[in-house]
Regions:
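Bacterial N-terminal signal peptides
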Residues: 9-16
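Surface-exposed short loop/turn segments
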Residues: 84-140
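A structural "domain/chain start" motif
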Residues: 19-79, 146-148, 181-194
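Second-shell loop/turn segments in exported
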Residues: 38-49, 118, 158-169
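Beta-strand elements of well-folded, non-transmembrane domains
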Residues: 35-39, 62, 106-108, 129-137, ...
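Hydrophobic alpha-helical membrane-association signature
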Residues: 54, 125-127, 171, 175
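Bacterial N-terminal signal peptides that target proteins for export
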Residues: 1-9
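C-terminal/domain-edge helix-coil "capping" segments
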Residues: 23-28, 132-194
Length: 194
């Protein structure tokens, strides 16, 4: 057993001392939010809670995500001069620019009694979203991505507004992050040539 420990320690030392291989820099993109739309299957009262929360989390992610360039100040109008716009993106190191529509495909809120705690209950919030990106300029399909999250939060017998807001914000944040991860994975794939 001792020789095996020595071998493992030696391997760990070699790995730690080996020069690190730098990963290729991640591609940069520009996303513009066009709309956050609840699907008809989502109940109206739940959509009323989900839509502003999801929209706020999407806007925040588009501003802060390291792979996204939030502002393209000085960019030519893509509708009037598409070639100049594409050249501008290349000079700024932006791989692509997209109009993004977010659909809320699933949303639910449920209060569940906790059997082991008589004075508490659990708030369960579920959010599922679908992102669709269309290229700027041209409005051809660029990517899709799906994300979902379920948050379970212990609350008292009376549900406070801030508990509900926290649960919706948390679920929306995780669902948006999940969808963006899927989008970026698809955007990193080599493009098929027609």
């Amino acid at each position: 057993m001792a020789p095996m420990k020595s071998l493992v320690l030696a391997m760990c030392a070699l790995v730690a001392l080996a020069p690190g291989v730098d990963a290729a820099p991640k591609k940069k993109f520009h996303f513009e939010l066009t709309a956050v739309i609840p699907k008809p299957e989502v109940k109206a009262d739940v959509a009323k809670s989900a839509q502003p929360r999801v929209e706020a989390q999407v806007k925040q992610a588009f501003e802060k995500h390291p792979q996204l360039v939030p502002n393209l100040e000085g960019a030519p109008d893509p509708l009037k001069n598409a070639d100049a716009y594409r050249k501008f993106l290349t000079r700024r190191g932006v791989t692509g620019s997209y109009l993004v529509t977010v659909e809320i495909t699933e949303a639910s809120e449920e209060l569940v009694p906790m059997e082991d705690k008589g004075s508490s209950q659990r708030l369960v919030v579920h959010v599922g979203i679908h992102m669709l990106g269309e290229t700027i300029p041209g409005r051809t399909m660029g990517f899709t991505g799906d994300g979902q999250a379920t948050v379970k939060q212990e609350v008292g017998m009376k549900l406070r507004d801030r508990d509900r807001q926290y649960a919706w914000d948390s679920a929306a944040e995780v669902a948006v992050a999940d969808a963006l991860k899927t989008c970026f994975a698809r955007l990193e794939l080599p493009q098929k040539k027609p």
